[in-house]
Amino acid sequence: MPVLTRSAELFEKAKKFIPGGVNSPVRAFKSVGGTPIYMAKGQGAYMTDVDGNTYLDYVGSWGPFILGSMHPRVTAAIEYTLRNIGTSFGTPIELEIEIAELLCKIVPSLEMVRMVNSGTEATMSAVRLARGYTGKDKIIKFEGCYHGHGDSFLIKAGSGVLTLGDPDSPGVTKGTANDTLNATYNDIESVKAIVNENKGQVAAIIIEPVAGNTGVIPAKKEFLVALRELCDAEGIVLIFDEVMCGFRVALGGAQELYGVTPDLTTMGKIIGGGLPVGAFGGKRHIMENIAPLGSVYQAGTLSGNPLALTAGLETLKILMEENPYPELERKAAFLEAGFKANMEKLGLNYTQNRVGSMACLFFTETPVVDYKSAITADTAKYGKYFHSMLDQGIYLAPSQFEAMFTSFAHTDEDLEKTVKANYNALVAATK
């Protein structure tokens, strides 16, 4: 068990000045118990905490570090920009054009793109744009999907909202809640029923094509195809939230993987290379409704800042040049197979879901295809599993309902260590 003396001291101090002692709820370890760990340094696939303990990292800053932490090319590019260009101007810069052009080349749905500062900003802006473009008010999302902390999305949401045990948030007005309609993931009939009940009122359907905030739940391809057909027939804007799965499950995201093209796409995480960033884009005739071309307002003081764009641009260049996706698939598949073999040895039959280098081990024997099946998972057992892995130097998400990210920086030795630790942790979790 790692000694966490300094982390415990810092957490006590933090609680005096920061609500709950953290700046994002899942970091508080409420669902797994114990002391939140304060990190001091990251390098490659490893993190070191303030007490000097080192961990093999499968959180990767919640997704951005597909190449690992402190990749030398990304770090060098950030340093060059910091020393030679600057941190922010509040004016247009050439880097904005370069990354926008590259994103439009990579992502199938993008004809135009707008940079913002977070995934939440991206999804909020995309929904506002869809409403402005269609002149309709209501949106459809899916139970358990998380699209950031905008008011419209905190109705039956996933991520930290689900981790806290309450999928809705106080502070969301009744009017907002009434305009947010929730369907069942992977169930096209539930979507059709809502559309028929709200004929001519639905502006957009927003979905994570690989849900990553209820654990990991892949959409069925036929479900996404049916959504595309329904949106075309009803004049509804289809939005893929690829903040998490974009550039991770494939270079062009889930829309490349599944071969289904949305009208709008939201992005983040990987395109910031570890710095705060987001983006939304899509069909030109929709994007042209954004100010200053159109009347749908969206703005940001630090949008398109040089540091974030530099980190994202260098990360994308590496992904294009080195094509790590076959190797990422091999590594993630090795872990999946190892975990499965361990469960077979122990007579366990827990559900594993994986798409590329995003994965989740659910402590339930129920196949997990939507929110209702996800919450059959035994969170108490996951808490025991989490702490056993932590004791063995493996850092996982401190919540059953988050993804495990494999990175290009994980070595075969790291993977073998993880499989061995998984066996011990499964034993500990099921005592």
UniProtKB/Swiss-Prot annotation:
Signal peptide: none annotated. It comes from the Bacteria. Keywords: Chlorophyll biosynthesis, Cytoplasm, Isomerase, Porphyrin biosynthesis, Pyridoxal phosphate. GO terms for molecular function: glutamate-1-semialdehyde 2,1-aminomutase activity; pyridoxal phosphate binding; transaminase activity. The keyword rRNA-binding does not apply. It catalyses: (S)-4-amino-5-oxopentanoate = 5-aminolevulinate. The keyword Isomerase applies. GO terms for cellular component: cytoplasm. Belongs to the class-III pyridoxal-phosphate-dependent aminotransferase family. HemL subfamily. This is Glutamate-1-semialdehyde 2,1-aminomutase. It comes from Chlorobaculum tepidum (strain ATCC 49652 / DSM 12025 / NBRC 103806 / TLS).
